[in-house]
């Protein structure tokens, strides 16, 4: 046994966070710590890592056992390069090696000196215990696995990004090889290949691993036990997260059955007491039942965190089949190309996941697709009848006021009961509906935005990293809601469980190139990508006469005119939408009607423009193909 917890408890003033927690950690345990946000997982970690020393009960670590914890803000030496920072983990070993070299020179002069031999053995043990002779091999292995290419090893630590610093801290901790490795959300800031490397590394780790994570894919691949922190206590389950779910369901069913039996017995005893206490002949028996009732401890009913949210995304308006059309779409920021010319069509009811390494431009691409940012070239077109809703990474659009006001101001015809019932489906119950929006956590802001989207009834969803800030149970609820959604979905995510559950194509964006893969497994195996219709890169050959050249010039001019007018219409569309949502227009029925009519006419004209543009492009492509076949 490496760690033992016995009746552990922790309170902050009158608030009890943990109570009567008992568990143990054995060598080679792989323990996933799960629970709702705020359940006490962080408090438990701070006790385990010695941050909190004031607690009830017993927490003991076996003598000689080392604990390693990934501190998010652990200091690194900004004067070193990446490789030098990794070597600094071996400072005692490097010191022992240097001392051994000096010692060996002395031993050469005095080979029979027993004290020198004894000191040599001590230094040798220090080096062997840390696998010092394989130091550089292990450093290179871990750096490569954690996503640091060899040409970056000389990069100064002081210029690394936040994500790179987090990966470097984790790499150093892995090298130190503590007996118990304690990790808090280790897959944050990691790309898919690095996640898989880390999973394989941890599965073969010689010590024990405790990890707090909301990443179900990771918990399923690595963990052999689950610690569920819930309602001030903790329960241990055998197996990975998928194995934990049915065990929890069975345990909750048994607990509910016992709770119901206890309540029924209490009611039966109380009924007997009420009927017989006043009768002289049955007073003693009633008093006996009263003592029995006073001693009865009613089993607490289970609280099901895994299924607390009840929401679905539904829509009313059926759009055109070709719903999101990308034509030679190009995105640049300054001199950097995020997306080279790319053509693709998302049809009604289809799903498309956008993935790629950090900084590849996924969120920028999503902003172009949902109309928040203009492309550098080409175009994005939403089909007729599209009713989009947008979930951005930063929920800045939710302003001040209370939670209940966010919904009520937008839907004033709803009664208070209707608003509160709706918010309850997204986890806002009781007094939490009156909580100020500025006091909400990231997870609460996300749930509030989901509450808005449900009422918007969109047939097209643009979601940018919607699982960020969500606990694992809310992620499960969101996954179920998206799987049940029959509208069109464009989704940026790094959640591998969500990706596999949706079982849809993945647009992988890297180094300016977009490639479509049929699934996550195909992406990781780098299987042949799904075919995507794109224009030939071979230039058209000119073999026409004068009339054909004239017509091609007309088509180019028409396409350019359509694109210019569509861009102007798009800008006006954004202006009108902003005006319609402003209080000045929203509260003026006549003005609102005028603006709405103008927007409707504008969108009809956009459809006409797009039809003309599409016909011209198709005719132009026919000329190009004909020209290519002339030679």
Annotated model-derived regions:
Residues 1-257, 308, 312-631:
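ABC ATP-binding cassette signature C-motif
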Residues 247-272, 276-296, 300-302:
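Intracellular alpha-helical coupling/juxtamembrane segments of multi-pass membrane proteins
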